Amino acid sequence: MSLSPSLDSLCLRVQPLSEMAESRALVAVREALEASDARRTVWIALSGGLDSVMLARLAARAVKDCPRRLRLVHVHHGLQAANDDFEQLARRLASRLGLPLSVRHLALAETALKSRGLEAAAREGRLAALSACLAAGDSLWLAQHQDDQAETLLLNALRGSGGRGLAAMPPERALAVGGASPGRDQRAHERARLLRPLLGIPRHEILTLARQQGLQAGQDWCEDPSN
């Protein structure tokens, strides 16, 4: 009697990559839900791109097992015609998932553009618009993933940002209600929390999961023309 496992039995034991991707992502999202205050609202920043679309879908699925109040929030940058497409996709997804959606229109000040540059001004304006939705104790979820983490570290290194710039993005941090950075004397109950549930998940797994669900670029998520 041979003790060697057959090829068929080995195949049965191997979890398909798509299932592994789904399992890892769902575990990450459920952990983020458990870390969020059950009495408060979880806001998911929905840009309309692949990563935020999948984060919203995963959260809508996971919330059935870990009840939380979910809301989506989309920031319209008003910088290019494609921003209208992003907003329309966000509205369709919110309707499909049965989740409320808030849309914020961003107006970047000319002084901010000149002093900070377009990318930095848009990033800071977006975070301010998102955090303005929050009440104390709420959570704001961003869809940054493992590849974003690596890219951030590389860009900061190339810019010579120093020790602070080389620090990794934290999976979560305090966020002052209204968008200001929380001061040391600010009491905990006046803060919200920013979480990045997918920070440990590589982008290829997110894409694999989207394809497994039959989603398509241009139809179920928008590709950023500036990338």
Outline where the language-model segments fall.
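Core alpha/beta nucleotide-donor-binding catalytic domains of modification enzymes
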Residues: 2-227
